[in-house]
């Protein structure tokens, strides 16, 4: 496993390229931090690498603002869990304020990612800050209704639901997830619901049940490239299993939109990232997000590289070129990064009525 982390990225020389697009692509690749032997030898997998310094572009102001404060108070009073808090998301201020910044100057629609099935995961992925246990508390049977009541009271048009892994439950928590979606749709039929799910241990029936619960976007993350799966994720997760989840979800409904996410900076090569993108496109995944892996603590995986904003822009353009309908790519981008903004502006307000309509066209043009 050590060797898979140490492989340098494969980059062709600029002198061998032809055309403006090729030159621009080469410059973006060259902007990425240099991969050094000393960096590769740090580890084996955890602790801080003294040679890898956090760059200025990752510095964020402390979250504040009226919208942020109001949403945080509401979530606390209702005893809801959010992945924004539990996973230490760096975008909490920006998303909860409705985009634009952590200080409350956003003018969009606030997006919070509600975490159902409790705050304790049965798996121990080496990148994740969420607490773990083999025997977490049983799910709260009132959580689906309480979550729906809370979200409906916020007046939002888009919500992201996610969950911890619950391998202790027969269906992995799929039915609980589905009940939450149905409760939301009953209280507010026009709301758009994205579900960022676990793999349900590859249980196709559980995937189908949730996919047909009324959700609008089925999201499941492959997290990293194939070669790093066993280093980064819990052994019960897997690259092919995650692809199978997304493929089955896509086939469950004609109008299903699917989404996945990849972390960068864990030791992946450019060719591996490209292959992961192609694997996702081969099963019809519509949306891809790419962001920088940030180490929650010294117990977690070491950051191998801080990818530059220019390189993230390269990956955005590359992803669009291979057919993703939308790509969000940036150092602080996460799975649910401003998800509501992307969809509300182009699905709800444009009154999408046909599954063939592209809700991302205007966003893609503007970027």
Swiss-Prot record:
[4Fe-4S] cluster 1 binds at residues 84, 89, 95, 336. It catalyses: [[Fe-S] cluster scaffold protein carrying a second [4Fe-4S](2+) cluster] + N(6)-octanoyl-L-lysyl-[protein] + 2 oxidized [2Fe-2S]-[ferredoxin] + 2 S-adenosyl-L-methionine + 4 H(+) = [[Fe-S] cluster scaffold protein] + N(6)-[(R)-dihydrolipoyl]-L-lysyl-[protein] + 4 Fe(3+) + 2 hydrogen sulfide + 2 5'-deoxyadenosine + 2 L-methionine + 2 reduced [2Fe-2S]-[ferredoxin]. GO terms for molecular function: 4 iron, 4 sulfur cluster binding; lipoate synthase activity; metal ion binding. The keyword Mitochondrion does not apply. It is found in: Plastid, Chloroplast. Belongs to the radical SAM superfamily. Lipoyl synthase family. This is Lipoyl synthase 2, chloroplastic. It comes from Zea mays (Maize).
């Amino acid at each position: 496993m050590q060797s898979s982390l140490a492989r340098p990225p494969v980059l062709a020389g600029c002198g061998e390229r032809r055309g403006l697009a090729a030159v621009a692509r080469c410059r973006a690749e060259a902007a990425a931090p240099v991969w050094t032997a000393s960096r590769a030898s740090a580890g084996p997998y955890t602790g801080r690498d003294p040679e890898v310094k956090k760059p200025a572009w990752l510095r964020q102001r402390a979250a504040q603002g009226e919208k942020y404060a109001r949403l945080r108070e509401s979530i606390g009073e209702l005893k809801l869990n959010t992945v924004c808090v539990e996973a230490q998301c760096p975008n909490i201020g920006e998303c909860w304020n409705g985009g634009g910044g952590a200080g409350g100057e956003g003018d969009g629609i606030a997006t919070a990612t509600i975490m159902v099935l409790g705050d304790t995961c049965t798996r121990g992925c080496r990148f994740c800050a969420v607490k773990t246990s083999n025997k977490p508390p049983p799910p709260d049977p009132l959580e689906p209704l309480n979550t729906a009541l809370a979200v409906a009271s916020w007046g939002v048009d888009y919500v992201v639901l996610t969950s911890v892994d619950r391998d202790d439950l027969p269906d992995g928590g799929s039915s609980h997830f589905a009940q939450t979606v149905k409760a939301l749709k009953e209280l507010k039929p026009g709301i758009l619901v994205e579900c960022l799910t676990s793999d349900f241990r590859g249980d196709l029936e559980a995937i189908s049940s949730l996919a047909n619960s009324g959700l609008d976007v089925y999201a499941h993350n492959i997290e990293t490239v194939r070669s790093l799966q066993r280093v980064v994720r819990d052994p019960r997760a897997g690259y092919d299993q995650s692809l199978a989840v997304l493929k089955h979800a896509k086939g469950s409904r004609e109008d299903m939109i699917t989404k996945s996410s990849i972390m960068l900076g864990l030791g992946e090569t450019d060719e591996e990232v490209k292959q992961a993108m192609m694997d996702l496109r081969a099963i019809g995944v519509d949306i891809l997000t790419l962001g920088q892996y940030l180490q929650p603590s010294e117990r977690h995986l070491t950051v191998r590289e801080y990818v530059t904003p220019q390189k993230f822009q390269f990956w955005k353009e590359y992803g669009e070129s291979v057919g993703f309908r939308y790509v969000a790519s940036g150092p602080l981008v996460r799975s649910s990064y401003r998800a509501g903004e992307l969809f509300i502006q182009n699905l709800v307000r444009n009154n999408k009525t046909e599954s063939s309509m592209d809700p991302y066209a205007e966003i893609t043009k503007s970027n």
